[in-house]
């Protein structure tokens, strides 16, 4: 009889343990499902933020391109004015060489390659002031 009780109690303990393991597995799988769902939500939010960030960066890049494109055109005009001033000054100092320089002209690519982008940011306003001043002097002289 004691043996039957021992077997019955052992059976109850084993079945209780099996139920607790099964419940643990179910709760674990439920947690995993919840974690996966939350990760999907986080990824969705992250993807949305990433797409918004990309579009904002594209717009910002486009704006910078337009702004610096205009500035490059202004720099180009300043360089043209400076070339004209240099040609005029050369013609005053050396009249025989002025015609040769005008015939040859200045290569725009060579002049553009002399300045890096950093130099343009620093020298751009200075060159525009010098160009405007020299242009005004030439108009007064001419």
Curated annotation (Swiss-Prot):
Keywords linked to the UniProt accession: Amidation, Amphibian defense peptide, Antibiotic, Antimicrobial, Cleavage on pair of basic residues, Cytolysis, Fungicide, Hemolysis, Secreted, Signal
GO terms classed as biological process: defense response to bacterium; defense response to fungus; killing of cells of another organism
Subcellular location: Secreted
Record-level GO cellular component terms: extracellular region
Pfam families linked to this entry: Bombinin
Modification Isoleucine amide, positions: 141
Tissue: Expressed by the skin glands.
Described purpose of this protein according to its UniProt entry: Maximin-y shows antimicrobial activity against bacteria and against the fungus C.albicans. It has little hemolytic activity. Maximin-H16 shows antimicrobial activity against bacteria and against the fungus C.albicans. Shows strong hemolytic activity.
Name of the protein described by the UniProt record: Maximins y/H16
Organism annotation: Bombina maxima (Giant fire-bellied toad)
């Amino acid at each position: 009889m004691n043996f039957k009780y021992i077997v019955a109690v052992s059976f109850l303990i084993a079945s209780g343990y099996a139920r607790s393991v099964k419940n643990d597995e179910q709760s674990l799988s439920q947690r995993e499902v919840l974690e996966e769902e939350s990760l999907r939500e986080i990824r969705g939010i992250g993807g949305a933020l990433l797409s918004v960030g990309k579009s904002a960066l594209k717009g910002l890049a486009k704006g910078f391109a337009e702004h610096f494109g205009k500035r490059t055109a202004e720099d180009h005009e300043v360089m043209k004015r400076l070339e004209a001033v240099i040609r005029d000054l050369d013609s005053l100092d050396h009249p025989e060489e002025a015609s040769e320089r005008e015939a040859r002209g200045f290569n725009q690519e060579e002049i553009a390659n002399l300045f890096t982008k950093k130099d343009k940011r620093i020298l751009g306003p200075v060159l525009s002031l010098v160009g405007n001043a020299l242009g005004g002097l030439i108009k007064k002289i001419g």
